[in-house]
Amino acid sequence: MNFINEKGDMPIVGFYGPLKIDYESKKGWKTPDYLTDSYFEMIRDAGINLINYTQMDYAKEPAAVRKALLLAEKYQIGIYVADSGLRGNMSHEELRNRMSEYSHYHSFKGIHVVDEPGSPHFGPKDRLLSDFYEIMQKLGAFDDVVANVNLFALHPDWIGVDDNTVWLDRAHYEAYVEEYCKNCRPKMLSADYYIFDAYTVATSRDYFENLEILNHYAQKYQIPFWMYIQLGGQWNDSLKEKETLDYYPQPNEVIWNVNTSLACGAKGIAYFPLLQPYYFAFAPDGEMDFERNGLIKANGEKSQWYACTKKANEQIQAVGNVLMQMTLKQMVAKGYYAEQNLPRATDSYGSLKMMEPEDSSNQYGVLAGCFESGTQEAFYVVNNDVKEAQSVRLKFDNAYEMELLSSECHEIVCAKECRVSLEPGAGILIILKEKQYS
């Protein structure tokens, strides 16, 4: 289905959108009015086309939700509405009547059901997927409504059990993802793995494993998967005053996070958080640190990640429509860290017979997602180094007319070999067109 528009644009999503909130800090800082043109304009200009959660419940704040929908419509941004008035025991007609209160807005794209539910073997014990089977199945029966649930990711170092949660191994995680796909009948799949909270590009094996799992179940159930990208860190759902750490990730790491997700088959990119919740800024002695996270700071200013996010989204806009129509078949990797972190990658696939960084001493290497649609092949090549640019040489089985596509490049070349130059963390899509000779 088309999640954004009839053109089939790739969803570029933000979690935590503008909302109605009144808060005053101990030092007298007050939350601004987020439900204004300026915030939606900033979101649009960054390339975001969908907000999948705003923290507002239509059942409790109908006027504020309607205002958000109206503003989003003005700036051609979609919104998923959270509405606790939608219940699993309602009939199809009752659900349709309830949603008719806001579904007439062009910005209405679906319903936010729940974030990070668990199962008996994975996640929180007090918020189980099974609690949402009925409402998910009933909302899923509407052709024009997406019911949005975001899952946990697999973190092997989290394994353990306490009073509230249970974290087990990959087999249990896969059972959790399968339970969701099988019993909730979703139109899309997503999970949030924030690599830079604990790891680096060099130690990204678990990150790529998560992408592999999501892609597997997305293909099995013939739905797209979306991957979350972290804009900052130091989340603070506990609402406690916290000392500030050094800020992370770096801009090129965000670029890499997006491009590797696309190479691994993601058909949607979701950023967290879009608008920094005010409590994510709580610092000692009543101070507020607005620099920690968010595309937009809680004080209303653009964050240090705004420019790199906009750049990443320009890349998605350039290649997204092609990738949305193609299926990932195999990963190719070359270079020490690329090969270590993608252990099931090969060194060639299909018409791509060789991919080599020109600087063989670069340990980070390069990777490529190998895509097909019918008989057409495409290769999404990514520089796995977030500090240094790389030149990459690719050799194919024959000479082809090739389309080279990125936010900074659109070329048609005819060759058996090509070289592409990639900035740190950057990617390029190579689409094979007509074979020139055998």
Could you tell me what each predicted segment is?
Residues 1-398, 406-408, 412-435:
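Glycan-processing catalytic domains of CAZymes
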